[in-house]
Amino acid sequence: MFQSDLFPAGEQLPSMPLAYAIGTRVAALLASGRHLTRTDISGLFADKTGVMDWGSAWTIDDYNNAVEIGALLWLRESSRIGLATSIHEAEARFDWLEAALPPRHVRSEAQVELQQFSTPPMLAWLMAKAAAVCAQDTLLEPSAGNGALALWGCLQNA
C-alpha cells in the first residue's frame, strides 16, 4: 500500500492536508489536459484558504508539495505510464507533464538547509524500471519527499 503523511490511507487523518487537497485539484486539471501556471496554482490555494499569495495561510513548501503531489497523482491515475511502457512513449508523457506544470525554482530555507530536492518523475520511473520492481518486492521510500520513488512500486503492488 502506498502511504505517507501527504497520501493518507483511509480515515487516518482527521482532515486532508492542504498540499494534498490542492494536489488532487492539480491532478484533476492535468487529467483534463490543462497546462497550469503559477497563477493558476496560487488561485487553487486562494480558493481553499482565501489568500492568493504565500506567506500567511500557505507556504512555498505547501505550493511545491501540492505541485509534486498533483504530478504524482496524475502519473498514478492518468498518465498511462507503467514499467512496461517504452522509453520513447514514457519520455513523451513525462515531457508533457513537465511542460504542463510551472517550474519550481523557489525553495524554502528549510528545504535548502536539509537538502530536500525532489526526484524528477522520469528518473524515479527509470530507477523502478531498471530494478524490475514487481509485486514480490518490498520498497522503502528513502526520502523526505512525497513518494516519487514509491509510486512505481505502488503501481506494481509491491
Regions found by a protein language model. Give the residues of each.
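Class I S-adenosyl-L-methionine
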Residues: 7-157
